[in-house]
């Protein structure tokens, strides 16, 4: 992974141009699409509208190998991201603890409203406290919209194929993803902490678990409502308005 093209946009927002090359990124998308076609991975709706997530293929995956990629490419990418995240604050990569590492697919009409990755909208910490750092690897750029924006910093990042964006996920870096107006946006998303879970008091962890359970239940209800509308041929825009759209054959169930 290439960490040489480091561009520090703010003290805690960094992009790495050509973290992976365009050919590798294109092959990774083909691998993901092949797995989805075969049903060996499933795109599951997440908390952002018309955004879907899946686990990544394991090392020695036959479709990875058939594309001529290293058998452990996804492990290599993860290790590279760990080093990139650590580099934002000159941390020892050995202390970086994985919270989430997955792929995401953003369909036309998808967006993410302004949010903090590890606090609520008022800056209060809770169940997502450990998502201190975020990093997103962009696997394609043949879509319209889908900018990563930090309104407070008046900063807008246009995804480029192979680019990695790494930043502190907290209240000081509230961010959003603008509406995908056409095409499909593929990313590898990840969240990280700089300490292990057992560094936090058990009582606090128990409180987080209870809050997480409640939050996930609410999100599941919301996602079910979204999916029901999709089946009927309707989507929801960023302002909450429902509109009709032309359905494709392979709508998500």
Question: Whereabouts are the PLM-identified features?
Answer:
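Fe(II)/2-oxoglutarate oxygenase catalytic core
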Residues: 1-164, 172-253
